[in-house]
């Protein structure tokens, strides 16, 4: 995407993204629409802007657009919030089985992040994941058939199985962390 396209998306998002009225601690107000948690990320807002543009083109009323943005719970295994356990946010983005999807998930994740990467690779270059981690508080735990390649690319910790990765994430993630399952790989090697 070019900077010109980014500007166009931002302008469109400003025009159609649901928001609300928020009062800051200093008493100042922020007005506009805010979406539900499932769409509360840069890519979620971009997706909503695109959907709202199409809906408006089709003549769907503004009130329905607002309600849809507020009520949308997301899709299973696509940045699905599993819950907050032990002071950590657990997110299932197991449909992120390619590098581009993982980069987008990392872009949206609130730091610090512990990302679980691994499984059976698809022959992709993992360097874009390392680039997306650069300068951010992200720890990778890498498992499965491509675990070694992912650990090498990201500087992450290598383990054998997804179950081990989950245990280590649970035990080592700092309070307030996001634990993100976005494997960049298929899971065929993890289940028999």
Language-model regions, residue ranges each:
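Short linear capping/connector segments at secondary-structure termini
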Residues: 85, 184-186
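Acidic, Mg2+-coordinating active-site environments of NTP-dependent enzymes
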Residues: 1-90, 151-152
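Short amphipathic alpha-helix with an adjacent loop that forms part of the alpha/beta core around
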Residues: 130-131, 167-172
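Short beta-strands and strand-loop turn motifs
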Residues: 3, 180-184
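Glycine/Thr-rich phosphate-binding loops that ligate phosphate moieties of nucleotide
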Residues: 165, 173-178
């Amino acid at each position: 995407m070019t900077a010109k396209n980014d500007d166009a998306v931002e302008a469109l998002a400003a025009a159609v993204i649901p928001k609300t009225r928020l009062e800051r601690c200093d008493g100042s107000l922020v007005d506009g629409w805010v979406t539900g948690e499932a769409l509360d990320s840069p890519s979620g807002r971009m997706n909503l802007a695109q959907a709202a543009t199409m809906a408006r083109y089709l003549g769907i009323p503004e009130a329905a657009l607002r309600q849809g943005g507020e009520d949308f719970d997301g899709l299973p295994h696509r940045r699905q919030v599993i819950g907050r356990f032990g002071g950590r946010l657990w997110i299932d983005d197991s449909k992120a089985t390619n590098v581009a999807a993982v980069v987008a998930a990392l872009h949206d994740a609130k730091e610090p992040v512990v990302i679980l990467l691994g499984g059976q690779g698809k022959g992709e270059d993992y360097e874009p994941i390392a680039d997306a981690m650069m300068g951010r508080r992200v720890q990778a735990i890498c498992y499965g058939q491509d675990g070694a390649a992912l650990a090498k690319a990201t500087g992450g910790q290598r383990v054998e199985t997804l179950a081990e990765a989950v245990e280590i994430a649970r035990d080592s993630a700092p309070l307030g962390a996001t634990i993100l399952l976005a494997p960049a790989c298929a899971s065929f090697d993890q289940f028999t």
